[in-house]
Structures are given as structure tokens and as C-alpha cells.
Amino acid sequence: MATSLPTDLILPHLRELNRNAADLREIRLMWRLIEASARMQASQQGQALVSMLTDTRQGLEQLEQGLLQSQLAQSAQEAMAQLGMQSAHAIDLLVRSLYERTADVGFLAADTVLCEAMARLGDGDDCGLPDMAAGGLRAWQAPLQAHLQAHLQSYRAKYTVYDDILLLDTQGQVCARAQAQAGRKPPPPCAEAWFQQSLQQAGHVSHFGASCVLPGADRLIYAQRLLHPRTMAVLGVLCLSFDFAAEMQAIFASGGPRAQVGLLLDEGGLVIASSDAHWIAPGSRVPMHHGDAVQPLIHAGRTYLVRTARALPYQGYAGPQGWQTQVMAPLDLAFAAQQRPQVLQALEPAIAEGLMAQARGFCPPLHAMARAADDIRRVVWNGQVLAASQAPESPVQGTAHPDPLQAVLEQMGETGDLTHAVFTRAIHGLHETALSTRLQEHSTLNRLLMDLLERNLYERANDCRWWALTPGLQKVLEDNSGCLALSVQAYDSAQRLLEQLNALYTVYARIALYDAQGLVLACSHEDEAGLPLAPGTRVQASALQATVLLRDAQAYHVQEMDDGGLPVHVYHAALRAPSPGSEQAHGHAHGGDQGPVIGGIALLFHTRRELQAMLQAAAPEQAATAEHGAATDPEDSGLPRLPMEAFYVARDGRIVAASHGGRPLGSCIAGVAGLASLADGEVRSSIEEIEGHYCIVGMAAGRGYREFRLDQGAARDAKESATDDTLAGLVSLSLQRLGPVHADARNRALRLASAPRLDGARPA
């Protein structure tokens, strides 16, 4: 946080700070009056008291200025930190989702059923019939079109992130689509730039905007050309239409309160998508702010706090060029939206007092203000003692002479008590702000961690079911049914397909093909000898049985393995022979969804590596100083950056993955409670004593992503079909140490509990 704050702009919107400022000004004026009265009425012996009052008044002025500036900085930092985290998390979720789309389009464009069918359409089926360019689909082509449509639908049924999948020939004519509707007028041939680029380019092409093939709203399309399986001539283009609007609303919904707006921008600040189109509509242009300094910006006559986040590449992919996310909060709502839970009141008194004793580590301004307030109270007390000791006594009956300074002493005592109450409340508020900021950070972090996990597992569940539809793998198993090993040609074909898949989807350590008896026939990364599922080995009996019993092509099974003490999960899907009557035009089957199981595909998901990468991206490791364990930042005048640990854990607390080393996998963190009772979608953050330290503890349970873990019917069917996704039961956990437990905190809390309460609140 930069040290310069636009105080005049921010201060009017901080009600609590303004109330404290008014009280402190009143206190300062009262001390000025006391000092003036003492100067007028003090005797020669009372000059020491006047000097002490001057020091007190000056100390109060410095304390007032420092306290207000600290409260202002803390409130501004909390607001900017929340906006920054939400903006960064939004672009991170989007980029990871779109990375999967680039792999999907590459996989499906190589599908041999699609390529063979497109070749037949273009070749006129070797019967001299007109090709696609001569006028589109005709009656003779209807069975082939139905075959293509069914094949596309079998893919889309497993990936609802796509609202349509289309096949275009080289002239831009739509040949088939997953979402075909009877009676719908076909779109005109496509001649758009992205389509022409797809025909000429080997890799995928992405396009966002209007398109004649999908009229209506702007679309995000991932396209890649299809090649003739024998001549390698370009046959057309496969188009995956991403359900962009629903995805953006899901990402925005996982962010902050309604008092702010989330945006997706291009590199020039043009709004592509908005969480509230009635507030800031797509097509608007907004100012951007990539730094963390508080710099209010004006848009459409309203002043906002703004944080913009650029994409960080994931697996080398950074999303469409220039895309970035931004969160904007109106200045008049940004601080009103800050929740002020009674953090200290909810804590055990001993923990609250211990945190104040450790404030230097997690909130240096709070530590400085508390020490300054103690110094002021000490000066006031010394002044009262000094004045009382200098009051002259009457020789008659030991009574004191009436002295003008006595009124000053009385005012000094009353004002000292009031000063203590006002500063106690202000410091209490600063303490609340510091702690609530960190608690909110942990809530936001854990919500992101679960969003990342569920989206990742959604992709894994869909990958295995997609690839089980691969015609080349089905053919290998069919042609070699009953053989002890694959022929050289079949082995080469299978391994080549598996290597191509693994090259597209790098999150897998290995992809293996096995027969109905569980014998692994081929795999990717065969040269990596230490990995499970090598050719010639067998799939675990329980996993094989679960895979064979899978109900249909929509079901899958997850197997948990122990690879040298490290967790590894294997996603299994069944490959099926074509069922009777499933063959369509020209003797080709489309997917083999309901036939008997002839084998399976196994995706070795390196759980620790991939989950650790997610944790490290969301909670990067901070360098720490030796004295306080807090990272130093010369540009940061707010809260120090304390090291934070993040985990994915089982409900019983066993660590499955950790952001940083130091804790053995499979171990539990003593003192962390409440994981088993987390409800779906619940997020918690609290302050606990753990391992001899005061710690912020955050945790969250998944709330589901699309149909993944949401549809109760699907969940029931999954149980019946032996689908057991153990990863889906994980929860996230974060831990941040604020400082060692203070030895005298409990005794101090007991003493303060019995102390006079001047402001109606527990003394701080």
C-alpha cells in the first residue's frame, strides 16, 4: 500500500473514524483548556504541573493524528485488498477454465469418427454424389448427419460448459451440430476471419464476438481444423461454443458483495462482461488501476475504488490476448460494505489480550498506538500525583487551603478518565479492523481454493468419459479381444493416441489403456519407469470391478492410490463395444455408449503435484523476517505480509496437499476443529490457539460446479454405478500465525475483567 492516501476523498465515508475524530478533537480542546487554566492559576511550585500538561497535550495531539491515520490506512487497505483478491481470483478461474477448452478442441478435432464422416461428405461417399460445396446436405446425407449429431451429442452430454458443438465444411456450411433443432433455418455459410484462420492454421483459434453460425449474443468459440485421415487435406472446422455468459456469472457470483461490480475487460478497458449489466454495461469503457495504491477513479460521474488484474499464465496459457478482470466499488459504498463483526467480543478474553500483546507482529500501528496511549495515561497519573503532593496545608486542623489549582486537578482527573475511554474505544476499533481484514482474506482465499478444486475435478471427471469415446482406442480393444498382448501395429496406434492425449492434457502423469481383465496394454510416458499402470501390469481388482459395473458412458470411477506415500488418484472410464443397432451410416458406430465393457481407460492424476500448484498459486510463499515472521515491503504502510499456509484436507483433518513444505502429507494439524461439520458451500474463519501460536484459521467446503456435486439425482446414480470420487469430499484449510501465545494473557484478562468499565465495553 502506498503511503500517500487521498484523505479528503476517503474520510467523509468512514463513519466510525469520523466519530472517533470528533471525540478526539473534543478531548484535545479539553486538555487545551486545562492547560490554559493551569497556566493562569498555577503557583511557582505548580510550574512543573504546567510543563507536564503541555507534554500531555502535545502527546495527545500526536497520538490523535497517528491513530486516525492508522485507522484510515487500515480501512483503505482492507477495501483495496479485498478488491484485489477478488479481481485476481476471477481472472485466475477464467484462464484455468479456458485452458481446458484449448485442450478439448485439439482432442475432438482429431476424432476419427468426425474426420471419416467429414471425408465421406466431401468425397460424395465414393459414389459420384455431390459434395458439400455443391449445395449443402441433401436427403442421402441425412443418416450421416444424424450419425454426426449423435456423436457430438455424446461428447456434449459430458461437458455442459459447451452450449453447442458444430462441424463446418471448408465453405463455412454447417454440416452437423450437437444442438440441432428440427425446423431451424440453417445459418448462412461462414466467411469470417476466425474461420478462415482456422482453415490455414495448424493449432486452435479462439474468437469472441458475434458470429453468423451462432447468431444472437456474443460467443466465445474455440475452433480447429479437421484433416482427412489419409490424405491430410483440410476437411473443415470443428467449433466448440463455450457457455461464456453462464461461466462469467458463476465466477462473478463467487466474488464479493452486491455493493461492487465485477468486470471482464479487454486490454483497452472495454467491458466484455459485467456482473451487473444495468450498472456498467458491456461495451462501456472504464478506467483501470493495476496497482494497490488507493487511487479513486471517476466513471460516469461516480467515484470508485478500482483493482484490475492481468492474467497469469496457467500451463503456458494466459487466455485471450489482453483480457483482464476488474472489480469496482463506489467510494460511498466501498467502506459501508466492510463488515464490522465483533471479533474481539467473540474471542476468549485471554486470546484477545494475548493478541494485543502480540500486535507488533501482525499490526505495527496498533502496537504503536497502544504504547502511546499507555504513555499518556502514565503522564496523566504522574501529573495528578505531583499536583496533590504540592497542595499547601492549613495550620488549622490539617485542612488544605483553598487553591485555584484544585479545580484544574479535578478537571484533569475527569478528562483523564474520558481520554482513556475514548482512546480505548479507538484502539479497540483499530484492533477489530486489523483482525477482521485478515479473517476476510482467509474467507476469500478458501472460497477461491474450493472453486479451483471443484472446477479441476469437473474437468477430470469429464476427460476420462470423453476419452472413453475415442474410436481409435475402442477399435484397438475390439480388434485384439482375447489376445494376451497387442500386435505391434495396434500397440503403436494405441500408444500414439495416448501420447497425443497426454500432450494436450499435461495435468496427467500417465494415461493407460487396459482390457476387460485389467491388463494394461499401452500407456503414455512409457519411459518413466517409476509410474504405475505400465504395460503388462494389472489394474487393481477393486478398481477394475467398479469400472466394469459402471452403468453407462456418463459414469466414472475414482481410485485412490498410494505412490510411495504420496496421494495419487486414477480416473477410470469404461470402453464399450458398439451395441446392436447402434451402427449408423456406412457401418460406423458413434461412441459405443451402451454396449458391453471391453476395457477401460485410466488417467493417472498426480494429486499432490496438481493440488499443490493450485495452493501455491492462490497462497504464494512469503519471505519472512527473523524477528516477527512478517514479510517486509517498503511500499506497504498497512498490515505486514505474514506467512500463510494453505491445504486441501480430508474431513478428518488429514493433509492431502500443502502449499509449502514442513508438514507431512497424511498428518493432521492439532487444534483445528470443525472440518467435519462444514456444510456444503460453507466458509469459516476464526482465531484459535494452535501449536502455541495465535492463528487465523480459514476453511471452506465445496458448493458444486455446474452439475458436478450439485444434482442429487446424479449423485445417487453415481453411488449406484460405483462412482466414488474421493477427491470431491476434500475441504480447504488456511493457517496464518499472528504470534506466540502470551504467557500472562490469561491473568491479564482476569485483571481487566474486574477493572472499571468507562466506555461500556470490555477494556482493551
Where are these regions (language model features)?
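Solvent-exposed, extracytoplasmic
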Residues: 147-159, 237-290, 331-358, 493-505, ...
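Extracellular/periplasmic juxtamembrane segments that couple receptor/chemosensory ectodomains to their
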Residues: 2-74, 284-437, 667-764
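Extracytoplasmic/periplasmic ligand-binding sensor regions of membrane-associated signaling proteins
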Residues: 149, 154-247, 293-305, 500-614, ...
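Conserved long hydrophobic alpha-helices within structured protein cores
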Residues: 102-110, 219, 237-241, 298-308, ...
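Short, surface-exposed beta-strand-loop junctions and turns on beta-sheet-rich folds
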Residues: 181-183, 213, 278-280, 312, ...
